[in-house]
Amino acid sequence: SVLWNEIVEEEKKNYPDVKVEHILVDAAATYLCLKPTMFDVMVMENMFGDILSDQGGGILGSLGLMPSACIGPDKAYYEPSHGSAPDIAGKNIANPYSMIGSVAMMLEFSFGMVAESRNLWQAMQSVFAKGYSTPDLSKPGAGVKMISTSEFGDLVVNELKAMPKV
C-alpha cells in the first residue's frame, strides 16, 4: 500500500546501511522460489507475510520449519508461522522446530540472551544432524530415525544439557 511504502521510506532514513528495495508481492513470491538468496530480511504487512511464509515453508519442505516474530518498537510476539493444525492435534506427530525456533528468537531479540538462543538453534540442528526426523520431513525407510514431537523435544533438551553452561 502507499501508506506502507511511505512508512518504510521514512524509517529507512534511520538505517542508512540497510538496502531497501520495494518489490510487489507477486514478484517477491517468484524470487523466493527462483533466487531465495537475494533476500536477507523481508518486511511486509501481515497478510503478505502469512502468504510468503507459507510459501517459504513449502520450499523448505514443511511449515514446521518456520518460526516467526512480529517485533515492534515496544512489544513483540513469537509464534510458529503455521496454524494450529487441528488435523494432527494430539497425535504427537507435529514438528516442534518452528515453536522452539520462535522461543530461540524471543530469547535473542526480546531478552538479549544471544548465547542461549544460539545454543537452542545448535541443539535442534544437532538432532537433525544425528539422523532424526519428524514425519513431516521424511518417509519411513528414508534412512532417518523417525521421531515424535515429544521425542524431538527430549532430544533437544539432552543436547542442551550436554553443552557447556553459558
Residue spans of the language-model regions?
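Glycine-rich phosphate/diphosphate-binding loop of Rossmann-like nucleotide-binding domains
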Residues: S1-D26, D40-V41
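Flexible, glycine/charged-enriched surface loops at secondary-structure junctions
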Residues: Y15-I23, G112-N119, A129-P140, V166
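Short alpha-helical patches at coil-to-helix transitions and adjacent helical residues
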Residues: S1, P96-I100, T149
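A glycine- and small/hydrophobic-rich beta-loop-beta segment
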Residues: V20, V25, A29, L34-F39, ...
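Glycine-rich phosphate/pyrophosphate-binding loop and the adjoining helix
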Residues: Q125-V166
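Glycine-rich phosphate/nucleotide-binding loop
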Residues: Y31-Y132
